[in-house]
């Protein structure tokens, strides 16, 4: 007890006497700092601290800890295993998932100094040791080298049992150059390959590791490796490639420089200047814009006073058929017609209506001369062959030059021969005889002329002088002429239609001079009524002596209000039948009725007994004969 009191007194008196003895100053030790604890494998851990000043006196350090949930303070179990200013906790003193409260105390002759307390958990303070046995090998893959790096985990890390799991990272850099490290994450594998190496370069390689929850370990020792030269054989190839590339680049540069002007014009074409006629650029530059614009503006535009009718242009459209469209085409209807002079047009195309009664084609020139020649030749032949019939032929020729058109036949087409016709004259109500001639068309029957016969022209001329005439009332055109008479037929086809059916009945009246009779001869095998005129009593025997005498004859009485032909029955003495063999010298004509069947001049007529109506007064009404079925 007395010793302890003496020690205390000594310590109290010592500071008072020490400064006076050697002139030094003493103080309490400094506070320990930077306390850290690390566990390399989660089984043991070590704590380090940094000591403070000792105060001029010998100072000792002690580590005290207290476990979580306990008030018992424990001192460090081992100050020597981990080195100076450290404390090592072995497996017996290490617990995981338990927090440790650690405090370091510095003590000297003047007193004690306590550090700040530090709480640690062994699980989160794990920092393993660096990997061991680092090896680097140069490998080749298809002639290209690469580095294969391998290592082993720290010896104290129990990675096999899974107590601790480590991940690795390595870094590589060239030795000759002061370049930065190139880091590569390797994961949990203990081998890694490095590609894209420089030929002949030396590389430095290091590896480190860390647990799932913890800190990276220190870098392992550096491993050096040199990559062999693997591009020495290709140096010449690369040199050649560079030379050729430079040559091509130089050539392209020279071509671009030589063609720079053309290229400039191609990519950047020049902007054309103003090309306005009368544009003065000097006036524009001087700022006199009014004068420039006044030179460009046209005076009196738009025109204030102008006869716009002068600007209109009238066009005259003339319809000219190709190669006489009136020529008959076999098996076809002919609708071509020319617009006659002085006739009104019924359409904007300039083509006259084919339904007008005045649209007859006016022949001139050679056709007229041909008509005159044919008429003269016909007269001569008629005089030589048919001399006894002169009186009757002269009276029959006006009828041969006329066309009988029914008022009901509005769509009838009559075939004519120009050799016996003159131009059609306009209708005049004062001249009924001329109006009748204007509206009639003569139609000769060519049934007796075989196609292509050389004497057809001669027969036609003789028939024109005959005392018989034939009228066609059908809707179909007669059979066309053969190729022997193409020119005659081309100039002779005329299409004539009645004017508005019944609008002009007076123009169709028969001549007022009722001196000519019509004899009903017979009905032939084609159902045609054969008639022949009887101008006088003595000429009738001369006209056709072979004709048999009948008990009844028909006299043209007139035309009734319905435009029907009225024939008067009359008894005449019979003539002898001795001249019956002379039938070849007479040419008969017939009034044909409308049927679908075609003949040489007109279709086969309907039965005559169905077309005639005998009136009570003794007249034969043939109005139905001339009415055409539409």
Curated annotation (Swiss-Prot):
Keywords: Disulfide bond, Glycoprotein, Membrane, Metal-binding, Receptor, Repeat, Signal, Transmembrane, Transmembrane helix, Zinc. Pfam families: EpoR_lig-bind. GO terms for cellular component: external side of plasma membrane. Residues 339-389 are annotated as: Disordered. Residues 380-389 have a biased composition (Basic and acidic residues). The chain crosses the membrane at residues 235-258. Residues 24-234 are extracellular. It is found in: Membrane. Residues 259-630 are cytoplasmic. A motif (WSXWS motif) lies at residues 216-220. It comes from the Eukaryota. One of its GO terms (molecular function) is cytokine receptor activity. InterPro entries: FN3_dom, FN3_sf, Growth/epo_recpt_lig-bind, Ig-like_fold, Long_hematopoietin_rcpt_CS. It is a single-pass type I membrane protein. Glycans are attached at residues 92, 101. A motif (Box 1 motif) lies at residues 267-275. Residues 31-128, 130-230 form the Fibronectin type-III domain. Residues 1-23 form the signal peptide. Residues 340-357 have a biased composition (Low complexity). This is a receptor for the anterior pituitary hormone prolactin. Belongs to the type I cytokine receptor family. Type 1 subfamily. PANTHER family: CYTOKINE RECEPTOR (PTHR23037), INTERLEUKIN 5 RECEPTOR SUBUNIT ALPHA (PTHR23037:SF46). This is Prolactin receptor. It comes from Oreochromis niloticus (Nile tilapia). The gene is prlr.
């Amino acid at each position: 007890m007395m010793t302890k009191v003496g020690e205390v007194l000594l310590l109290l008196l010592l500071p008072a006497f020490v400064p006076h003895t050697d002139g030094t100053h003493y103080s309490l030790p400094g506070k320990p700092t930077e306390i850290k604890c690390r566990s390399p494998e989660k089984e043991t851990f070590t704590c380090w601290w940094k000591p403070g000043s000792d105060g001029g006196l010998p100072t000792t350090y002690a580590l005290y800890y207290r476990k979580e949930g306990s008030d018992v303070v424990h001192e460090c179990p081992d100050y020597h295993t981990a080195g100076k200013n450290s404390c090592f906790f072995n497996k017996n003193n290490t617990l995981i998932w338990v927090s440790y409260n650690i405090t370091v105390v510095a003590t000297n002759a003047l007193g004690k100094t306590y550090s700040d307390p530090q709480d640690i958990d062994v699980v989160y303070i794990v920092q393993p040791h660096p990997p061991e046995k680092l090896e680097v090998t140069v490998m080749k893959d298809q002639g290209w080298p690469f580095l294969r790096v391998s290592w082993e985990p720290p010896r104290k890390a129990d990675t096999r049992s899974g107590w601790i799991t480590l991940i690795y990272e390595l870094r590589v850099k060239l030795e000759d150059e002061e370049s930065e490290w190139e880091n590569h994450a390797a994961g949990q594998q203990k081998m890694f390959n490095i590609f894209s190496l420089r030929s002949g370069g030396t590389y430095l390689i290091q590896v480190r590791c860390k647990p799932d929850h913890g800190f990276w370990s220190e870098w392992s020792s550096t491993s050096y490796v040199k990559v062999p030269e693997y591009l020495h054989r290709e140096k010449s190839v690369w040199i050649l490639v560079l030379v050729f590339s430079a040559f091509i680049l130089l050539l392209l540069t020279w071509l671009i420089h030589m063609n720079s002007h053309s290229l400039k014009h191609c990519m950047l074409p020049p902007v054309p200047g103003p090309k306005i006629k009368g544009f003065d650029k000097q006036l524009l530059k001087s700022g006199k814009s009014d004068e420039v614009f006044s030179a460009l503006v046209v005076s009196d535009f738009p025109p204030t006073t102008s006869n716009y009718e002068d600007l209109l242009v009238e066009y005259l459209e003339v319809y000219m058929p190709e190669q006489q469209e009136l020529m008959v085409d076999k098996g076809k209807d002919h609708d071509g017609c020319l617009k006659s002079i002085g006739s009104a047009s019924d359409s904007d195309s300039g083509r006259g209506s084919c339904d007008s009664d005045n649209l007859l084609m006016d022949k001139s020139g050679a056709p007229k001369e041909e008509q005159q020649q044919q008429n003269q030749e016909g007269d001569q032949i008629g005089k030589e062959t048919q001399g006894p019939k002169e009186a009757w032929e002269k009276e029959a020729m006006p009828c041969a030059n006329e066309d009988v058109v029914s008022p009901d036949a509005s769509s009838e087409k009559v075939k004519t021969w120009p050799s016996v016709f003159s131009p059609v004259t306009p209708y005049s109500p004062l001249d009924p005889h001329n109006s009748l001639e204007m509206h009639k068309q003569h139609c000769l029957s060519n049934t007796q002329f075989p196609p292509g016969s050389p004497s057809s022209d001669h027969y036609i001329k003789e028939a024109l002088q005959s005392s018989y005439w034939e009228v066609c009332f059908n809707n179909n055109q007669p059979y066309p002429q053969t190729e022997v008479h193409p020119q005659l037929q081309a100039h002779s086809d005329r299409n004539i239609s009645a004017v508005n059916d019944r609008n002009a009945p007076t123009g169709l009246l028969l001549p007022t001079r009722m001196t000519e009779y019509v004899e009903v001869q017979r009905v032939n095998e084609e159902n045609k009524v054969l008639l022949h005129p009887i101008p006088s009593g003595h000429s009738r025997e001369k006209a056709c002596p072979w004709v048999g005498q009948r008990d009844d004859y028909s006299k043209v009485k007139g035309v009734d209000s319905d435009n029907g032909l009225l024939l008067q029955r009359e008894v005449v003495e019979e003539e002898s039948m001795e001249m019956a063999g002379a039938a070849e010298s007479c040419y008969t004509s017939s009034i044909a009725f409308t049927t679908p069947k075609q003949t040489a001049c007109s279709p086969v007529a309907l039965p005559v007994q169905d077309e005639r109506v005998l009136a009570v007064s003794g007249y034969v009404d043939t109005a139905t004969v001339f009415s055409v079925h539409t």
